[in-house]
Swiss-Prot record:
Residues 251-448 form the GATase cobBQ-type domain. Pathway: Cofactor biosynthesis; adenosylcobalamin biosynthesis. Belongs to the CobB/CobQ family. CobQ subfamily. The active site is at residues 332, 440. Keywords: Cobalamin biosynthesis, Glutamine amidotransferase. It holds the Pfam family CbiA. This is Cobyric acid synthase. The lineage of its organism: Bacteria, Pseudomonadati, Pseudomonadota, Gammaproteobacteria, Enterobacterales. It comes from Salmonella gallinarum (strain 287/91 / NCTC 13346). Catalyzes amidations at positions B, D, E, and G on adenosylcobyrinic A,C-diamide. NH(2) groups are provided by glutamine, and one molecule of ATP is hydrogenolyzed for each amidation. GO terms for molecular function: ABC-type vitamin B12 transporter activity; catalytic activity. NCBIfam families: cobQ, PRK00784.1. One of its GO terms (biological process) is cobalamin biosynthetic process. InterPro entries: Class_I_gatase-like, CobQ/CobB/MinD/ParA_Nub-bd_dom, CobQ_GATase1, CobQ_N, CobQ_synth, GATase_3, P-loop_NTPase.
């Protein structure tokens, strides 16, 4: 029988996704066929499977930790917020509809049977399933239609481990309060607690651990220290917590504009891992002053974020920075914003709007979303600081609902191989100071990334780095470091799975 264990949290961003990846890595190292599963994920960081399905990035990197190919069954429901009240609903990797929160809450019971069927299908193929909840199981206003926390644990008939973040303070209150708000049958599923992100001498916690175990009857399985591991974050909460402010001095500074609806900021993890690069996510115009490159990232609401750029003064500052000779790059929604004109009758309904005008392009939004993994080749001739990237192979994925047409004065940045056909993508100006593409994951291509960074180094009179950093090997090292730390600090996971597994 397939064994399963589920991680739920006292709140969002307590570290469930990373610890789930660590469990996937441990079971993989121990020779068990393991898969991650999250029934419903709300995130703007998504990726594309080999068969063109869209799923949450968290389950993609958990699958990588487990040594398997990501499968959309690992995340059957993906919610991508388009505003404070609306979200795009992606079912089994394809866009279904847009809904507000109330409509989706009413819709959830219809998903329960489908989610269970998908889970059972996955469980038949693996020895272990590592499930992840969302937010907290103590959201009592959502309990009656829950499909992602205790509702999912009930469907999978699996034990639950509660993860609590001590770094934000109030960890014992969070543990006690969460367990107190659960129904008895839900509380009985919780077989242990992990206290996560601890800094300092763990001996200071012992008396508190004894008391919380006595008060709740639930054992603390371990205290995970704050780990300096470089792994993906599920969504923008990490940006709000200043994790990526990048204060360490490096030769090259890259400023990424933190749009209100920023998506796929995992595009820049490989850049951040470069030994000579400092990444800074910025929201204030004055923060552009020391940038060697400015990047406009993806957006789930392009025109809304473009309006924010103008209202915040960021657009004027970005254009001024560009006039001073600093290159500006756009990816997906950011690429669209760099153009002359955006025609949107789909996403926002705002019609025709002017872009920033750095690329002579016109973008028209469409109803159908392109979701595919692609191989590509950079154009054979690229100007200025991009010249070393000319002709290089790159790989990535597309997630967009717009088509961008180049006008006079722009050259194609690369050629994609999409479904067996060659497709032109991206645009670059003659001076190389404005460059855009729809290709997410571009910087995971090591040779391209080093060529770009060395081009920026040359602009500053710095010698190039001859050694190319291998991001794939770096990720493997991070998975192994995480697994080693979890083995050292957490007990009884195997015992819990073996003793508390129920037949589905």
């Amino acid at each position: 029988m397939t064994q399963a264990v589920m991680l739920q949290g006292t709140a969002s961003d307590v570290g469930k996704s990373v610890l789930a990846a660590g469990l996937c890595r441990i079971f993989y190292q121990d020779g068990l066929r393991t898969a991650p599963f999250k029934s419903q994920n709300m995130a703007l960081n998504s990726g594309i499977t080999s068969d063109g399905k869209e799923m949450g990035r968290a389950q993609i990197f958990q699958a990588e930790a487990a040594g398997i190919t990501p499968d959309v069954r690992m995340n059957p429901v993906l919610l991508k917020p388009t505003s404070d009240r609306q979200a795009q609903v992606v079912l089994m990797g394809k866009v279904a509809t847009n809904m507000d929160a109330v409509s989706y809450h009413d819709y959830k019971p219809r998903l329960r049977e489908q989610i269970l069927a998908v889970y059972n299908s996955l469980a038949q193929e693996y020895d272990v399933i590592v499930l992840e909840g969302a937010g907290s199981p103590a959201e009592i206003n959502l309990r009656d239609r829950d499909i992602v926390n205790m509702g999912m644990a009930e469907m999978a008939q699996c034990p639950v481990i509660l993860v609590a973040d001590i770094d934000r303070g109030g960890v014992f209150a969070a543990i006690y309060g969460t367990l107190a708000l659960l129904h008895k049958q839900e509380r009985d599923r919780v077989k242990g607690v992990i206290i996560n992100k601890f800094r300092g001498d763990v001996a200071l916690l012992y008396s508190g651990i004894e008391q919380i175990e006595s008060l709740t009857g639930v054992p603390v399985l371990g205290v995970m220290p704050w780990l300096d591991v470089d792994l993906e974050d599920e969504d923008g909460v990490a940006l709000q917590n200043d994790k990526y402010r990048g204060n360490a001095p490096r030769d090259i500074t890259i400023a990424i504009v933190q749009l209100p609806h920023i998506s796929n900021f995992t595009d820049f993890n490989a850049l951040a891992a470069q030994p000579d690069v400092r990444i800074r996510y910025i929201r204030r115009p004055e923060a552009l002053t020391d940038a060697d490159l400015v990047i406009l990232p993806g957006s789930k609401n392009t025109l809304s974020d473009l309006a924010w750029l103008r209202e915040s003064g960021m657009a004027d500052a970005l254009l001024q920075t560009h006039r001073q000779g600093v290159p500006v790059m756009g990816i997906c929604g950011g690429y669209q914003m760099l153009g002359d004109t955006i025609v949107d009758e789909v996403e926002s309904g705002l019609g025709t709007q002017p872009g920033l005008g750095l690329l002579n392009t016109i973008t028209r939004f469409a109803q159908d979303k392109i979701t595919t993994q692609v191989n590509a080749t950079m154009s054979g001739e690229l100007p200025s600081w991009l010249a070393a990237a000319a002709g290089l192979p790159v790989r990535g994925y597309e997630i967009h609902m717009g088509e961008t047409v180049l006008q006079e004065g722009c050259c194609t940045a690369m050629t994609l191989q999409r479904n067996g056909c060659s497709v032109a993508d991206g645009a670059v100006t003659a001076d190389g100071l404005a460059f855009g593409t729809y290709l997410h994951g571009l910087f995971d291509s090591d040779a391209f990334t080093r060529a770009v960074v060395n081009g920026l180094r040359a602009r500053k009179g710095l010698a190039p780095w001859e050694t190319t950093f291998c991001y794939a090997e770096h990720k493997v090292r991070q998975f192994d470091l995480l697994a080693e730390a979890m083995r050292q600090h957490i007990d009884k996971i195997y015992t819990i799975m073996q003793q508390h597994q129920e037949p589905v």
